[in-house]
Amino acid sequence: MVQRKKEGVRDAILEAAFRLFSEQGYSETSIPGIAREAGMSTANVYVYFQSKIDILFQLYSPWLLGRLDKLERAQRRVADPQERLRKLLLTLWRDLPRENNGFTNNVMQAVSTSSGNGDYSPALRQLFQSRVAGWIQECLATPSDESDMLASVALMAFDGFAMNVRLAHSPPCDDDMARLFSRLFAGAAASSAPTP
């Protein structure tokens, strides 16, 4: 017998998971715990989601895509390319990792503990990097392969700031750091530009 999925049940699972991921972190949250929090059986959770990482990405993907759209609109409002790059790095390294009580830290926990059995898809990360590379290319007028490399470095730093957001003595990204790295990125782009 095929079980019919109900949107209200799915939403209850996602709400319960969000609460637990926010309070306990990804590593300390379990499917049975999510089921208890949502007031249902563990088996019922598996009717709606394949795994804990699936639940996490059902929460994280729309949030991240919304933030990237918002960031794109903010980028369009800044005329100066160097200032646009500084604001991009500040958003990536300070603002996004801190939002929702450092919720992005859960993604770092999930990816670092993924078993490699196909439960993690890099599609969202690839989209994220592609959009960041496009913005960097607009700011620095670099070839796409170099913009992609710079975006990769920017996202590795994003990962680090997302992991550190919950540590008591970790230095956060601030305006001075974003300004310094925007100049470093610009210098790297300028040094690789062909000379006339």
How does the language model describe each region?
Residues 58, 72-98, 150-154:
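Hydrophobic alpha-helical connector segments
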Residues 12, 16-54, 58:
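Helix-turn-helix
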Residues 65-69, 87, 115-142, 148-152, ...:
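Amphipathic alpha-helical packing segments from all-alpha helical-bundle domains
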Residues 1-7, 192-196:
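N-terminal intrinsically disordered/low-complexity leader segments
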Residues 84, 96-119, 167:
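Amphipathic alpha-helical segments used for helix-helix packing
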Residues 94, 129-141, 152-153, 157, ...:
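C-terminal peripheral helix-coil segments that are non-catalytic and often amphipathic
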Residues 52, 59, 63-67, 81, ...:
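Hydrophobic/aromatic residues within well-ordered alpha-helical segments
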